[in-house]
Amino acid sequence: MNIDNASNWDPQALGLVPMVVEQSGRGERAYDIYSRLLKERVIFLVGPVNDVTANLVVAQLLFLEAENPDKDIYFYINSPGGSVTAGMSIYDTMQFIKPDVSTLCIGQAASMGAFLLNAGAKGKRFALPNSRVMIHQPLGGFQGQASDIAIHAKEILSIRDRLNRIMAEHSGQPLERIEKDTDRDNFLSAAEAAEYGLIDKVLTRRDAA
């Protein structure tokens, strides 16, 4: 996780977005695939966590809560992580809204991606069998006068402590173990993530949930 803002990332840069055509009594209606899945209460975080992607996820979470505050939201994550502040805006919104947010790791959930995966509703956090999870402490690369560097170092340590305490709460692991295990990059398989408490179950088929 980087405490600085990650570079802007355009979801459209993933390439051509498929369109889905639906028939209705009024004729045909075309949706991009993500809008169609949003109707099914599915949200994607694909790529780095930054202000752009975080704002999109937060807006969709709030929209789906307004649509139906009693139905679960399904949050699919394939992310290498990114900005702590952007990620925390997603985390806080997940905790703030009324619907349960079920998280599912597809591909990878690293750094802030792993943090958000772990933050899903208890019993509703999943990963596909070949996905990877990585946890570590926040990164910082501030340059400047010694006094300013000291200020930023203190802030990084404060953020690290806050993130570790939240992860301990959601995973059920002792804070001391979280601190030890996030001191360096720590890679886990889906099964290891389940054993650790970052997720609740490894899914091999949809009906296994």
Swiss-Prot record:
Active site: 111 (nucleophile), 136
Name of this chain's protein: ATP-dependent Clp protease proteolytic subunit
Alphabetized PANTHER family for the sequence: ATP-DEPENDENT CLP PROTEASE PROTEOLYTIC SUBUNIT
Subcellular location, principal: cytoplasm
PROSITE patterns noted in UniProt: CLP_PROTEASE_HIS (PS00382), CLP_PROTEASE_SER (PS00381)
InterPro entries per UniProt: ClpP, ClpP/crotonase-like_dom_sf, ClpP/TepA, ClpP_His_AS, ClpP_Ser_AS
The organism of origin for this protein: Dechloromonas aromatica (strain RCB)
Gene for this chain: clpP
Catalytic activity: Hydrolysis of proteins to small peptides in the presence of ATP and magnesium. alpha-casein is the usual test substrate. In the absence of ATP, only oligopeptides shorter than five residues are hydrolyzed (such as succinyl-Leu-Tyr-|-NHMec, and Leu-Tyr-Leu-|-Tyr-Trp, in which cleavage of the -Tyr-|-Leu- and -Tyr-|-Trp bonds also occurs)
UniProt GO molecular function: ATP-dependent peptidase activity; ATPase binding; serine-type endopeptidase activity
